[in-house]
Amino acid sequence: NGKPFCYGVFYHHGWAAGRSEGAALNAVSSIPKWLHGTDVVVVGHAHAKTGTKLAAFEPDWTCGQFRKRRIAAGITGSYMLWGSYGRERGYAPKEEGATVVKLSGKRKEAKIVL
């Protein structure tokens, strides 16, 4: 429609408890419950290098209804190879490197690229 738009992006060191990828995804998926207006949420800490799509309902004050906001959520990979810490504590090796967020310039759409 030619109208400008902007993205709400939240990057954080993160937190997660547990050894599974699911534990890390649970941590990142809880953020839109208390931080409204985000289109992209990316955290670290778990070093899981994964992503998912989330959704949240938010009030649209222009029409007095709720609308669904689509949220791209990701976790960054590690920047250390599987070394002493992970090996000594029995963690499985993780994927290294950044989680990339691709923002569309034509429509309001964000994707996590692994």
Task: Locate the predicted segments by residue.
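Extended recognition/assembly regions associated with phosphoester-bond processing machinery
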Residues: 1-114
